[in-house]
Each structure stands twice: as C-alpha cells, then as structure tokens.
Regions:
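Disulfide-stabilized extracellular recognition modules
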Residues: 82-190, 194-196
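A solvent-exposed, acidic/Ser-Thr-rich amphipathic alpha-helical stretch
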Residues: 61-90
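Short, well-ordered surface patches within globular domains
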Residues: 6-69
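Disordered inhibitory propeptide/activation segment of secreted metzincin zinc metalloprotease zymogens
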Residues: 1-3
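General secretory precursor processing signal
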Residues: 24-26, 77, 111, 168
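Generic structural "secondary-structure junction" signal
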Residues: 39, 62, 70, 74, ...
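Generic short alpha-helical segment signal, independent of protein family or function
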Residues: 52-55, 77, 94, 98
Length: 196
C-alpha cells in the first residue's frame, strides 16, 4: 500500500514526538524565566499541514504568514531510516542561544539569521505551540513548529528574550505529557520577521 504523504494526519494527543518536543521547549523556556507553552490542536494542524507540504514538494521554506511564529528543521536522508526525537529538534533550535547577545536590542535582520530559532522558543509573550513532522519519499524528515503569539518582533527582544536564570532545574522532563487541546485564534496585528 502506498500512502500519499499529503494525506497523513497526526493527532497530537497521541504523538510522543510532539509531546516530547513541547516538553523540551518548556525546559528551555524555564531556563529563561518564560512561562510554559500550551499545545494548541489548531497550531498542530497548521504545522502538520505545512510539514506535509514541504515533504511532498521536497522544498524547505517558511510559510508566508506573519501572524504565527515559525521554526523549521530538516534532516536529509542518509540511506538509513533515522527517526528524530522532539528533544533533538528542540535542542537544535535552542542551540542558537550561542549567537544571541543579551546586552542590546538586536537588528531584526541579523538576529533572526543568527538566533531566531532560539529567540522564538524562549519568547516570553508566546503562549501556544503546535508541531508537525513529515517524511518525504526520499526519507528526508521535516519538522515544523508554529507559535502564537509570534516572537521575533522588532523592538521587543529585550523584554521577551531573557538571559538564563542563575539556577534552574537540571532534570530531564517526563517522557510524555498528556495535555488538553486548546483553541487559539490566528489573528494578530503585530508585524514579525520569519525566524530561521
């Protein structure tokens, strides 16, 4: 049986990958005194639809939608079937922390190129997250995360991207979270730059 990748749907409530990714987002947010994110079924659906599109078309680019924050991850196929974990993806995005300068309001164009994945993860005013994952016919894995309200807003970095706390728990998150679905409207009048 051949399954058309554009028809794959993920129920986030049953996805260990999605709950693991959310959990690690919240571990990193806690390090920066940001409140925990809540998973949104609407954002999961949008992220899964976009991940399916990218995998099906074998392309890799951000949605043209300034009303949501976005992070993308891609692992090309190396001939072996390799699964990615939510921890691996969130850690990859967070690793851009090394590029961020807490001492000044960054130039949005340069900040997003260097640290946009990180800043979106820890953006204090972001409250909701949705994640989708798809595999292309060639085996490439694409992961998409969408955030509401979006981060990486020019002029708002200083109050939304806080330095790491002196002390934070260094315990691994639980392997699986069961979270209630949430509904988030996607209307926003703030202008953002796509994060990379």
């Amino acid at each position: 049986m051949v399954l058309d990748i554009s028809e794959i749907r993920t129920a986030w409530q049953d996805s260990d990958f999605i709950t693991d990714c959310l959990c690690w987002h919240n571990v990193y947010r806690q390090r920066h005194a940001a409140p925990p994110l809540t998973m949104s079924s609407e954002l999961c659906h949008l992220a899964q639809t976009w991940a399916n599109h990218l995998a099906h078309t074998n392309r890799f680019y951000y949605r043209n939608d300034r009303d949501i924050g976005q992070n993308l991850f891609c692992r090309p196929s190396n001939g072996l079937v390799q699964e990615v974990t939510g921890q691996e993806v969130a850690t990859y995005w967070y690793s851009a922390v090394r590029q961020y300068d807490y001492g000044k309001e960054p130039d949005c164009l340069h900040a997003n190129v260097n640290a946009g994945h990180f800043t979106q993860i820890v953006w204090v005013s972001t409250r909701y997250c949705g994640v989708g994952k798809a595999r292309s016919r060639s085996g490439k894995v694409v992961v998409v995360a969408h955030y509401m309200p979006p981060g990486n807003i020019s002029g708002s970095y200083m109050e939304n991207v806080l330095p790491p706390c002196e002390e934070y728990p260094r315990v691994a998150p639980p392997p699986r979270l069961i979270l209630p679905a949430s509904s988030v409207t996607t209307g926003s009048s703030r202008t953002t730059s796509p994060s990379t």
